[in-house]
Structures are given as C-alpha cells and as structure tokens.
C-alpha cells in the first residue's frame, strides 16, 4: 500500500541520487490555456528521466542478501538506465533484458552504467517474460518498471517536490506509460490535497489506460504506435 510515511521516506532517500528539477514557468502555455502552467523537467536527471527515483528507492529497501543476489529488470530504455545507474551506486550487480529493437544508444548507455544487457524478444512483453524467468532462475530480485508499489512510491516523490515548491497547485498532468509514475504521483497528490485534480495523459497510439478504464478491466494492446518507448 502506498502511504504518506513511505512517500516521505522515499523523498529523503532519493535526494541522494536525483538532481534538483525546479519548476519552470511557461509563459507561452500559460497564455494559451489561461492558466499558470509549470513544467517539472525530469529529463534533466543524470539518466535523462525520472525512472532512477523508483529504482534507487527499491534497492534501498532490499536486504544485503537480496542485493548480493543481484537485480534483473526489463526495459526498452529509461527504466533500464535508471536501474543500471542505481545499481552501480549501490554496488549491486544488475542484468537488464531489452527488446532486440531497442535503439543502440540506449543499449550502450545502459551498459555504460555497468549493467549486463541481454537482448531478447522483439517487444517489451517478450523481454519482460524472459527477465522474470531469468530472475527466478538466478534467485535475483526483479525490479518491475511500474507494477511495483515500492517503485511507484519512488516515482511519486516528484509530487512531494511539486507541492513543496508550489503549495497552491490544483492540477497535475502526468504521463502514463505503464502507470507507475501516475500511480505514485496521483496517490501522493491526493494524500496531500484530496481536492487536487490529477490528469493522466497517454499517447493516442498506446492508450491502454483509457481502454482499460472503458472496459472496466486491464486491457493489453496487441501493438502500440508511439516514439515514447520506455
């Protein structure tokens, strides 16, 4: 369960690894929308994305024995680099399974942080299934990119920073891919202000959340069409 205590704990822990990403006021979008619009530039993190938050916090909760057995994850890019970088800081071995279609630059950057990269499957789901099997075989901890409450708690620390810098915030727009960021941010935002509105935004070509809400159950799309590859 995602709780305020855990979010506060995670917020302190991720300070060890994240760079400050102060809100940036957008005059253009403020004029276009008739609102005061700010951006939270998480692309300025060392690994290029917020994903390191969840990965770093996840590792911090593991026992020494679990860390010694290593980590396994699956990702097409950003989560891979987040786990690899966080694992390097903790001195923990990490294996990242990436689809064979992953851009070479993301593969090389993940390797650059010290992780072992295994290319398997043409899509994320195939890579993920193989990673789960590998983690079980090796007795390692599988760090899911989104379907993990600890990881989601780490991602949600973004909301804590937003509220500290802009206490009067009344709407937060959050991107949705797997849903880990949205789960963390929306949960913490509602804990801090029950009246706040959180709006999830996803690519039209990868709208699994909308499809799931419309169907009233989890829906898996046969394919996606988006440049946001994870």
Language-model regions, residue ranges each:
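PLP-dependent amino-acid enzyme catalytic core
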Residues: 1-230
């Amino acid at each position: 369960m995602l709780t305020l205590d855990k979010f506060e704990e995670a917020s302190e822990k991720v300070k060890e690894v994240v760079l400050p990403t102060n809100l940036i006021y957008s005059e253009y979008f403020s004029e276009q929308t008739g609102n005061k619009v700010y951006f939270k530039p998480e692309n300025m993190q060392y690994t290029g994305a917020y994903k390191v938050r969840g990965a770093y916090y996840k590792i911090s909760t593991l026992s020494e024995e679990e860390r010694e057995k290593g980590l396994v994850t699956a990702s097409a890019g950003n989560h891979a680099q987040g786990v690899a970088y966080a694992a390097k800081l903790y001195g923990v071995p990490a294996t990242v399974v990436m689809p064979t279609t992953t851009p070479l630059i993301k593969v090389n950057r993940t390797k650059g942080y010290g992780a072992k990269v295994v290319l398997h499957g043409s899509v994320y789901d195939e890579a993920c299934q193989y990673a789960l099997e590998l983690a079980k075989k090796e007795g390692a901890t599988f760090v899911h990119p989104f379907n993990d409450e600890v990881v989601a708690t780490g991602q949600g620390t973004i909301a804590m920073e937003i509220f500290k810098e802009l206490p009067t915030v009344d709407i937060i727009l959050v991107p949705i891919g797997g849903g880990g960021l949205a789960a963390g941010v929306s949960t913490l935002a509602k804990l801090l202000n029950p009246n706040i509105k959180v709006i999830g935004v996803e690519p039209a070509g990868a709208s699994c959340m909308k499809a799931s809400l419309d169907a009233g159950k989890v829906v898996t799309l046969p394919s996606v069409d988006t440049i946001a590859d994870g």
